[in-house]
Amino acid sequence: MVFMTIENVRQEIENIDRELVELIAKRVEFADDILKYKHQANLPINDDRQNDVVIGRAVSIATEKGLDSTMVKQIFNLLIQMNIERQHELSGEGNLP
């Protein structure tokens, strides 16, 4: 068993936090790409059915990993809302729903 000091553990958490933010940024970039497809197909920015699929998938994974699925659902709702607001901004619509 490897003994880690509290500083080591905090450093590992900091590394994970950095990775999480980088993954969020990558997710936003892909959402920007999706906006282009939505514009070409004349689709609305918000797609409740797709949002439900994304949240359902996240909740399922959270359950498999023994995580609080309610909290994971809240996190993914925030991620989706962030993407929706960004897509509105890129469309010149500000953050209107």
Language model segments and positions:
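Domain-level signature for soluble enzymes in the chorismate/prephenate branch of the shikimate pathway
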Residues: 1-97
